[in-house]
């Protein structure tokens, strides 16, 4: 009796990723790394390879390609997923892989005046999003994915769902954003109403929620605060729906605002988060509070901002100034 036909390897990977409800970004990244791994070994099938070939590829990324530690870790995760979840081949722990060293770099931080200059040069919805990122310490993807129900005006707080590491947290809602956010939400819900009348209006929901609350996708509270300006086709389901504002559009707007402000620091949307943390510590807030607002698992991650505060030898008089 012949073995049942199996779909191509990459299609099997895609199906397994979707079965586990990983994000589209993770799906795209894993498939890309698996393709690179196969091409690196001259199109040999991964089932005919093992830990040695995985180690060779990951070591090559560090020794020859000089990739960052986070890049190597993503490649390793993709290959471990391939072997364990798709091919059902257990690999021994890859202790002998040359690891990319994560450099000890201080985060780029803007002064309060520089933040003000940048925010003044952002326009439209990007201006509000920029103020929200700086005012709450959100990551950019947390900002664009914010849902209406998670802006709690009465409590002056924002609930940040499923952040990095799949953890929810709460951050402060600045008083200066109360009115602009109310206006933005009114506009977002008006757009949602138009989508409903056009026969659409089903926002994307995580799989478990979509199964548990099948009607939630059309409810106002689940809509994005920053909806995309147009509807698009969901690449997985084929459903026409309105996604959230794209992060790349804001990144471009931020780069332009930094240039227009005459700031030479390599500031990005993440810089607003770094500046939020540093300015809170500079204002005297304790590091544990800042840790919770940022959603760091370990306080040592938050400690990097204390090094920024100490930069420049505060309290030390340069010998040059004594000449």
Predicted regions and their residues:
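Conserved catalytic core of the tyrosine transesterase superfamily
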Residues: 1-323
């Amino acid at each position: 009796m012949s073995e049942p036909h199996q779909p191509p390897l990459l299609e099997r990977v895609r199906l397994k990723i979707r079965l586990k409800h990983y994000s589209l970004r993770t799906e795209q990244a894993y498939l890309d790394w698996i393709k690179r791994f196969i091409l690196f070994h001259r199109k040999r099938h991964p089932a005919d390879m093992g830990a040695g070939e995985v180690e060779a590829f990951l070591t090559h990324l560090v020794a020859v390609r000089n990739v960052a530690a986070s890049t190597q870790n993503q490649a390793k995760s993709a290959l471990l997923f391939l072997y364990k979840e798709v091919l059902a081949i257990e690999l021994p722990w890859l202790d002998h892989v040359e690891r990319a060293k994560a450099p000890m770099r201080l985060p780029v931080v803007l002064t309060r005046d520089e933040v003000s200059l940048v925010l003044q040069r952002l326009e439209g919805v990007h201006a509000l999003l920029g103020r929200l990122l700086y005012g709450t310490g959100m990551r950019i993807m947390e900002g664009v994915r914010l849902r209406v129900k998670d802006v709690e005006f009465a409590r002056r707080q924002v609930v940040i769902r499923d952040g990095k590491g799949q953890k929810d947290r709460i951050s402060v809602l600045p008083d200066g954003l109360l009115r602009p956010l109310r206006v933005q939400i009114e506009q977002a819900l008006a757009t949602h109403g138009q989508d409903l009348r056009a026969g659409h209006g089903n926002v994307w929901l995580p799989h478990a929620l979509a199964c548990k609350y099948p009607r939630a996708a059309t409810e106002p509270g689940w809509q994005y605060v920053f909806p995309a300006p147009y509807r698009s086709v969901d690449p997985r389901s084929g459903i026409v729906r309105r996604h959230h504002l794209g992060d790349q559009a804001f990144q471009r707007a931020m780069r332009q605002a930094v240039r227009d402000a005459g700031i030479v620091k390599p500031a990005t949307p993440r810089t607003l988060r770094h500046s939020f943390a540093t300015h809170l510590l500079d204002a005297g807030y304790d590091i544990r509070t800042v840790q919770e607002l940022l959603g760091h698992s370990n306080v040592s991650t938050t400690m990097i901002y204390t090094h920024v505060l100490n930069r420049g030898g505060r309290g030390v008089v340069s010998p040059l100034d004594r000449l």
